[in-house]
From Swiss-Prot:
This is 2-dehydro-3-deoxygluconokinase. PANTHER family: HEXOKINASE FAMILY MEMBER (PTHR43085), PSEUDOURIDINE KINASE-RELATED (PTHR43085:SF1). The gene is kdgK. Keywords: ATP-binding, Carbohydrate metabolism, Kinase, Nucleotide-binding, Transferase. SUPFAM superfamilies: Ribokinase-like.
Amino acid sequence: MAKLITLGEILIEFNALSPGPLRHVSYFEKHVAGSEANYCVAFIKQGNECGIIAKVGDDEFGYNAIEWLRGQGVDVSHMKIDPSAPTGIFFIQRHYPVPLKSESIYYRKGSAGSKLSPEDVDEEYVKSADLVHSSGITLAISSTAKEAVYKAFEIASNRSFDTNIRLKLWSAEEAKREILKLLSKFHLKFLITDTDDSKIILGESDPDKAAKAFSDYAEIIVMKLGPKGAIVYYDGKKYYSSGYQVPVEDVTGAGDALGGTFLSLYYKGFEMEKALDYAIVASTLNVMIRGDQENLPTTKDIETFLREMKK
């Protein structure tokens, strides 16, 4: 059984029950979210282990996050409670102003999650992992969180990184500079990205050209293409898996579902093509409900989907 450790901010998500502008929405659902937490749960659903290094506030939302993730099987022993700052929250506006798309409105400045620091990274714990994962979000939330990622990556035997650029957290110029700096310092086993992020980082949105440039930094590259599917590049090879047409409730977390499922199935010994096909299903199921983690499927559930559904 493989073990993944992630570093990042855990957030509480308030997802609008009805589509449209938030000024007219009265009711919301509460969910535990955050990219690295989503990766953890997706990884566990395929029969592997995951722990997360993170901070939450000494508040009801923080305890909600700990209890929920523990219930999903996540090792929360390195989640710390910070009494000096609140757990970050965000609201999701769905299907407005663009149908089938979601917008996140964050209230996370000065959050407990942003106070993650190198002191929170235990060397022996990181050494116990087969793979250590983080994202551009963690680089962006604070300088100390970025330093925590650097420390963990220095220790890690294998590294995974999702570019996950959020322009509400930093400018395109800063994102490009900091991500290229990290890529130049640490060779990755996995780089997970998309064409929008590739355009910011490399000035190139063509998937094949971007993957060729990224191959200097990573062994395996997963290029997410939204509803069109995804491509995996490895050993000079390329495999494309198309998406499925399903009713879309909320696309938030779909990329994390894909990435976390793919990583886990790779460590289960799946061939790249099969791992990506299954990961596409996980991403597809994720967009059909509200919440980032509740619809993450097991391997058995994915296989049931594949028997019944056609692309």
